[in-house]
Structure formats: structure tokens, C-alpha cells
Amino acid sequence: MKKLLFKLFFALAFTSISLHGQEKIQQVEVHIFEGMALYSSHYTINFLYKEFEAKQVMGEPAELPKKILLLNPPDKWRVFTKKINLNKFKKLRDGPSQQAFDGENEVIIIKTDKKTYRKMNAYSNDHDREVWYDLLQIIAKEFGKKGIYE
């Protein structure tokens, strides 16, 4: 009887530890800053809403700034977060800044219940590039776009 109780206690304790050890994604953000014109766009997705904002700091053409805010139903949020492989994202290595050369910097931020992960231009090798652009594609589809730059 003692052995059975001990095994049951051990199994419950192990299950509790493994369930509490998983991080839950609370918010995903993408920030894109483009070179000398200082154009920036910002995507935010969390369990309450989806938001897109684009602005050009210099020159401000008539079509910018642009802002979209949509409600995000809980069932769609769960489907979205299941598509994201947080472990692969954590392993990405930041790349060098491209903005100084009139390029663009891409920053993805994933906030969990335990920590915030921030990666910039993390596409320096084939594996990182695949993970990076797959994540950008998942985010773009949440906004009904074919790609993040559309």
C-alpha cells in the first residue's frame, strides 16, 4: 500500500512539475524599422486583440499613419499559439543591424507568462532563416495577409 501511495504521489508531483514548467505565450510582436526614411510598422497579437500600425516619421505621405485594431477570439488565439514553436524561437541568434545601411531591422518579441524573448534579424543561416520566416508568415496570416510586407 505504501509503495502504491508513493508511486501515486510521485506521478502526481511529476505531472504537476511538467505542467507548471511549460511557458504560455501571452503576446507576440513584430517591429520593422526601415532605413533612412524611418518607416516603421508594428504588429501585436495577444489573447484580446490583433493590432497593426504603420507610420513614416519623415515625409509622412497621406496614406500613413495607418492603424488597424481587431478583436481576437480565444479559440483563434489558441490555434495561433499552437503554430509557434517557442523552443526553436529561443535558439535563434540575433543578426547585425541593417538599418544603418538603409536596410531594415526586423524584431520579433514573444512574451510568455515567465519571460520575454526578443530576437532581431535572426536569419543568418539556413535553419534560422527558415524558422524566422515561417514565424513571420504565421503572423501575417493572422492579419489576412500573404506576407508580412504586404
Where do the PLM segments sit?
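Short, surface-exposed coil-to-beta transition loops
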Residues: 37-43, 64, 102-105
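A short-motif feature that recognizes glycine-rich, charge-decorated loops
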Residues: 55-90
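Bacterial Sec-dependent N-terminal signal peptides
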Residues: 1-25
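Short amphipathic beta-strand/extended segments with alternating polar/hydrophobic composition
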Residues: 42-45, 64-72, 115-124
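Generic structural motif
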Residues: 4, 13, 33-35, 48, ...
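Short, well-ordered, aromatic-rich surface patches in folded extracellular/luminal domains
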Residues: 22-35, 81, 90-150
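N-terminal export/targeting and maturation segments
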Residues: 19-56
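Short, well-ordered strand-loop elements centered on a beta-strand within folded domains, enriched
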Residues: 49-59, 115-121
